[in-house]
């Protein structure tokens, strides 16, 4: 089954619920970037977080950029996600592997805190008009879910709960995804709604296990927490949306990037190499700029 976003509301429209599946997008990123299982999990979590944020944007060409700058061995990450469900991204150290750590439930987990270290989560929301909205918060623990919840609390003052996880079995990524539950802005001061959100979300003991057991049925995950969702609040067409890894790079963008070099640099490339190869950081696609194309830039 393909990746997707599912939307719903509860409490007569007072609580917004969004669930996202990013399994295939994460697998594609793993293949393109040569990611380890640790970095696959981290980037998959960042994919889920970015898409959850982008899902609330009003216009389809709206975009969210999620960047982590930190002192950990991961060396940061960058994700670009659209309201249209398209996502791409990369990490600074794709091959990173660390020892697993034991959790409170005596299970073993990736050491996200050590991988990311201390630093900052930066979120940019771009609606495609006016100045993009930018906000930065300190990392909480590097597991992305709590970091995103901190961003929503400090930057948007919205009571929210964020769950993000994945399941890896027999060296295969089985599933990756997330869930966002938040009191809508007009209801954020309603103590009963805030209490309801807190009580329902306490029922989630392990989102990764819930995601795995759901067999990609995101609506069932939502209904496990809020069985009384508002069925008619969102049209069927708007409720579900496709998600996929897709990059916006192109040969023309590569040519435009080359044109920003001065003529001396272009002549040096032409003399030494006779061509140029540009590699997209987001997807690793390669674009060859040949002798004639570079020569044309110099003459322009």
From Swiss-Prot:
Signal sequence range: none
Gene Ontology molecular function: any one: protein folding chaperone
Disulfide bonds listed in the record: 247-249, 280-283
Modification(s) after translation: Under oxidizing conditions two disulfide bonds are formed involving the reactive cysteines. Under reducing conditions zinc is bound to the reactive cysteines and the protein is inactive.
Pfam families referenced in this protein's UniProt entry, alphabetically: HSP33
Transmembrane portions of the chain: none
KW Cytoplasm (keyword) present: yes
Biological process annotations from GO: protein refolding
InterPro entries, per the entry: Heat_shock_Hsp33, Heat_shock_Hsp33_C, Heat_shock_Hsp33_N
Highest taxon of source: Bacteria
UniProtKB keywords: Chaperone, Cytoplasm, Disulfide bond, Redox-active center, Zinc
GO cellular component, one term: cytoplasm
Subcellular location: Cytoplasm
Record keyword Disulfide bond present: yes
Predominant location category: cytoplasm
Family according to the record: Belongs to the HSP33 family.
Entry-linked PANTHER family: 33 KDA CHAPERONIN
Stated role: Redox regulated molecular chaperone. Protects both thermally unfolding and oxidatively damaged proteins from irreversible aggregation. Plays an important role in the bacterial defense system toward oxidative stress.
Name of the protein in its database record: 33 kDa chaperonin
Organism of this sequence: Prochlorococcus marinus (strain MIT 9515)
Source lineage: Bacteria, Bacillati, Cyanobacteriota, Cyanophyceae, Synechococcales
Gene this protein is translated from: hslO
